[in-house]
Amino acid sequence: MELYVKDGAYCWSRERSQDAIASLAPMLVEEYDELHTAHDAGFLSRDHIDDLGNCLFRVCRRVTNQSGRTRRVKLVAQLETRFKPQDYLMPCILYNGNQWGSGNSPKGLTYDGKPWIFAYDRMGIPSCTLTENRDVGLALFASDQDKESLRTSASLVRQEDGTFLHRIYYPVTEAPVTYSGKNKMTQRYDEYFTLTPGENLSIAFYIFACVPKWEHFASANLLDRMPEVFPYRKGPRFTPERVWELGMSYLKRLIYPWQGKKLIIAGIDTKLSHLQAGHMGAKLTPEEMRRLMGLREYNTYGFHRIIFEMGWAGQGFLTARLMMIEAIRRNDRDLLDTAVDIQETWAAQQQENGMILPHFERYAECPRPDQKAALCQGWQPETCNLGWGASEMAKIYALLKENGLEKPEFLRFATRICDFFVAHYSAEWGFGKLWSMQGEALDTTGSVGGFILNALIDTWRVTKREEYLKTAATALDFYMERDVNHFRCMAGAIDCEAVDKETAFPFVVSALDLYEITGDEKYLEYAQKAAYYFFSWAFQYDALYPDTSDFSRYGYSTQGGTAISAEHHAIDPWGALLTPEFVRLWKHTGQQRWLLWARMMWDQSLLGITAQEGEKVHGLPRPLGSQNEGFFQCRWTKYRPDCEERGHFNDWLVSWLSAYRLTALDRLVAVAGEEDWSLLA
């Protein structure tokens, strides 16, 4: 069958056409590692194609074993492009090949010369492959109508003439190897259908074609159709008021005495979780991990990671500001004084040039950090933490001043960082990634410098210094043109070096801010592009798990969750942070999907929160309001001896999860303009 365009409409024909954009093959049959047509393999393949409107088609395919013998096979649906794509995508896995980054995560279309085949549950759209050029976009993806249709895998093959083969494998296959852990490859994984003589199998899949909304953005067109393909019918597990109570309860537990002062620690975990994650150079073999999983001393909660971090995962500054908001609301002077003291402790460490170590504990480890190289991620100042730090300090200064407390050192903290990056902005690489304490650029790669944009704009709101706003506008143009406009962001998740979704956050926020400040429509387009990119990492459907999995036992589902990065194939509740920004997009564009997606991400971020003191996960009572950071939906893990336990939780109860939800609620009113939190109720 040929898909072609006639009078502006997409149509199917059995006749070969020069105007065709794609060709749908009958079912292929893989047996003994060889692909055959259904006819040659002794199978009958019949299709029924439903036109769902606006270039979306559902293919219902029925396959019959006519060979007269029982067959153990894989089935393969194949769609061939009749155009030459310039970009390709497998959402949450491959963004035009993941050419940025030096790790051993998947890159390109092949491994050792053989095409990658990835399971559906690694992708936000099941078994989705997308190719595009300036004029046409084409996608093939699985249906969730039944388990045979959903439990699939996807592959893309580039042919010598530049055209592509989109493939869906039935059932699940991971080949030629399995990406099973951080930068780790293990043996391939195979499932098969066993079909007796005369037995039928019916499956469904989707084909989508479009003219890309913007160049490199056919994914935006595809995402626009997802609500009708995978309808969202859930609601929030808790009211917003209860979310605030639970989150604040947990964050207060993280106030930690440290060398005569109080700081905010990054989280609580078990000793085994700490070792599993590979912190402090620990390397556990699978055998050691299995042994330690049975020892009580390694499986009780405590403060096993002494981490005090400005932003990123620890979110110490944001947590302090949220405590100040809570203290002011409740007239809790002790809590307010504690939060202010914590920020004073941090501010005292900053150098005149604005540089500061983003991890406070490293001042104790190395009294002269300028004399030591970056021994681990985050040792030296990097733009993710510096951006968060300056942004939050500016907001803290404004909040306290509004409530009668002048803390000029907090504003000075923010302006020092902003002054540094105004002076050191590069037209070649923006704000860079890693800096020395002396102010020398150590690593200029990636998109992570975008976090400085929020710092500049938030500090401008307090100081009205035009150089901050001007530099932010210039830098946003740079990062959009170099990165976001090409549907990629890199290195915002500073524990990995890969294409990721976190780095899109500052571009969404700063673009919306500049749109509201200037009224320039280009910034609204910027915000939409960055938001579409971010949402390409969101799960549009619920993957399937056995009853014995953590996901099934504790009521976790994937729809609305966000994949972490091309290096870390797991889900986290990061989308909660973008909830108010998607509400802003809804208000500015009038497009209802932004509100729907905001609610999807918000609702999903509430799954796994401990709502009653002493609730147990993995047999361990968890603190009220806590939630684990990682949800491992596919055959990838850092927290199990092997990757086979799909659908498990880790035990790292980190602070940013609560901090992001609470700041989202605060911004829903303070920034998005809602009167209260009822929009998320």
Please identify what each model-predicted range represents.
Residues 2-412, 416-419:
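Carbohydrate-recognition beta-sandwich/jelly-roll modules
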Residues 8, 317-333, 388-406, 451-466, ...:
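Well-ordered alpha-helical scaffold segments within catalytic/enzyme domains
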Residues 247-308, 348-378, 421-442, 480-498, ...:
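Glycine- and aromatic-rich loop/turn segments at beta-sheet edges
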Residues 330, 350, 400, 418-421, ...:
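Alpha-helical junction/boundary sensor with strong preference for TPR arrays
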Residues 369-380, 394-466, 528-536:
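Active-site lining segments of carbohydrate-active enzymes
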Residues 442-453, 483-485, 495-508:
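Aromatic-lined, polymer-binding surfaces characteristic
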Residues 529, 573-583, 593-635, 639-649, ...:
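Exposed, low-structure sequence patches enriched in small/polar residues
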